[in-house]
Amino acid sequence: MRIITGDFKGRRLEMPENNNIRPTTEKVKEAIFSIIVGNREDAVCVDLFAGTGNLGLEALSRGAEKCYFADNSRESLDLIKRNIAMCKADEWSTVIPGDFEKVLTRLGERGEKIDIFFLDPPYKKGLYERCFELIREFDLLAEEGIIIAEHNVRDKLAEDLSGFEIIKERSYGTVAISIYG
């Protein structure tokens, strides 16, 4: 897995040793960033359920101002930190340990406004809905912000989640991307 373009182009990210961490494939990552290209420079991002930090680091490479990387797995957190260091992206990166509810609560308490959320939770029922509820509850999404949810193509997400509506949907094999705003 590598950074596709931008300041960190070509850098190979360290991969997980176990199969519990499921990084976004390069094909899907390329598709995500081709969809959101444009006014996303200087964005503040959250890579929730970050795993390897793949999506957040790609966003930073393409000009995002800051990225919060969040995960509750010790292995993932260590991997994210190593990948951030390898890309020399420490200045623009904040790693937040903990489950997604605590992380979103903490960001809400800080009054953060997020331009891009990357959501790639374990494919379990209810996690997407709860993420959207908390993003709404803490008013975390910036005015022109988007939420990018990666999910199994068989698990159709609702057209409207906590008042956020689907803007675009795409599928790539067994993976689907739903973008909300």
Model-derived regions: residue spans:
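Class I S-adenosyl-L-methionine-dependent methyltransferase catalytic core
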Residues: 1-181
